[in-house]
A protein has these predicted regions:
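P/S/T/G-enriched low-complexity
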Residues: 144-151, 174-181, 188-326
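Intrinsically disordered, low-complexity, Ser/Thr/Glu/Asp/Lys/Arg-enriched terminal regions and linkers
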Residues: 1-236
Length: 326
């Protein structure tokens, strides 16, 4: 590893999802305590790879996001350092103590919620991008050294929550920002169903998306797949996703759609033809709407008896867009 590397780690801290993940009925149950111990081992490996490596840890909690650790704050000596221990390496001791304590504090703050709001993954992703931008363009008089400013940046998302269709546009905006900053986004789906938006984030930024088949091998996945920085991945065999789900969320109902109708003016996506675009207020001819409605494929009913010719599985569009409103 020639140059330094920066890692921004985003941890999904949804209490309900981690409760489900730890159930003994799962093929490979994974508790949050075991998960966190493996994550700390992984970040220690990142720190040990090179002295100039930097680290930031963000927590995506229900309804909010928070920074749990920053190597810049640790180097500045903010008074929160753990007591010295002759039997442990100080940087490891600091990151383990700070991440564990701050995570517990954040979870205690949301413990009294009667209803769990969606996890603020987009907020954590935005904070990670802002932190990386601050590293790349440090203000005058800041504590960011030259090695940290020139570090190879990447973001690793450890996700357990399902997709939130309403966050489609903010996620895409974050992806475009990551592309502009040349930031690689890696995703490890630890528990739950596949996430459409995070698949696209990893694919569009040149990162890796891995769905854990064996959660009892979580640490091995982290070390073998996500420890090497992007600058070294062209010379090693890093697992890649075989297929990418490019479906989008409609702007009208925030649902993920297989077939979308796209406004030819502002590129807004709708699940059905509309007379007036709700985004740019463009009006479409009635003949165009009739033609698009007539061309919509027949959807088989729930009892399996179709009134028309159902599409074969291979015919499902991979882009999420099939028609344009003109």
């Amino acid at each position: 590893m020639d140059g330094s590397s920066h890692l921004s780690l985003i941890i999904d801290l949804s209490p309900s999802q981690w409760h489900l993940s730890a159930q003994s009925s799962n093929p490979h149950p994974l508790s949050f305590q075991t998960f966190l111990s493996h994550v700390l081992t992984f970040v220690n490996s990142h720190i040990a790879s090179k002295h100039e490596n930097t680290l930031a840890v963000f927590g995506a909690l229900p309804g909010k996001s928070s920074m749990l650790y920053s190597s810049l704050d640790a180097d500045s000596g903010n008074g929160n350092d753990p007591p010295a221990d002759a039997n442990s390496y100080r940087p490891f001791k600091v990151v383990n103590s700070v991440v564990t304590n701050n995570t517990q504090k954040e979870l205690d703050l949301i413990g009294g919620l009667t209803e769990e709001p969606p996890v603020a993954l987009v907020g954590a992703l935005t904070k990670a991008l802002c932190f990386i931008n601050r590293l790349a363009h440090p203000p005058s008089g800041s504590l960011v050294d030259e090695a940290a400013a020139s570090a190879d940046p990447r973001i690793l998302i450890l996700s357990v929550s399902p997709d939130l269709a309403a966050s489609y546009i903010p996620v895409m905006n974050s992806i475009f920002s990551a592309q502009k900053l040349k930031v690689t986004i890696d995703v490890c789906k630890v528990f739950g169903e596949e996430t459409v938006f995070l698949q696209q984030a990893a694919h569009l930024t040149g990162g890796s998306y891995i769905y854990l088949e064996r959660r009892d091998a979580f640490l091995q996945y982290l070390i073998m797949s996500f420890l090497p920085p992007p600058s070294l991945r062209h010379i090693i065999a890093v697992p890649r996703q075989d297929k990418v789900d490019f479906r989008a969320a409609c702007f009208c109902h925030k649902n993920i759609v297989d077939i979308g109708f796209v406004c030819s003016v502002c590129l807004s996506i709708f699940c059905s033809p509309v007379a007036v675009c709700s985004t740019c207020r463009t009006k479409f001819p009635m003949k165009t709407l009739q033609r698009l409605n007539a061309s919509r494929p027949a959807i088989p009913p729930a009892n399996g008896v179709s009134n028309g010719s159902p599409r074969p599985p291979s015919a499902r569009p991979s882009t999420g867009m099939s028609a344009s409103l003109r």
